[in-house]
Amino acid sequence: MALLYADEDFSYPVVQRLRQLGHDLLTAHEAGQAGQSITDTAVLAFATAAGRAVVTFNRRHFIRLHAEVSSHAGIIVCTRDDDVLALADRIHQQLQSVPTLQDQLLRINRPARA
């Protein structure tokens, strides 16, 4: 399963569900990185040094970072979804569909509302 780093704004219930699905997640809070106004560049560098892909709701900045940073452990950008179990399941399905996260950008979108 995937080694992931959930940034400060990421949903803890989604983290918990992904852990139940077998993924190894470290949160910014657990890493002592929360509440310090750490830049997105530093978040990505920290995660990459730990061999973990960043999982975030901060789509705009991390999509830009993916284009700017030549090597990273992966970036997963998500659309916020009140259905946290469904979001976690979509992330899990995407993770199972890629052989590696190294230098990859995964976009996890909320389904269109009917």
Positions of the model-derived regions?
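Basic, amphipathic alpha-helical patches used to engage nucleic acids or provide basic targeting signals
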Residues: 40, 50
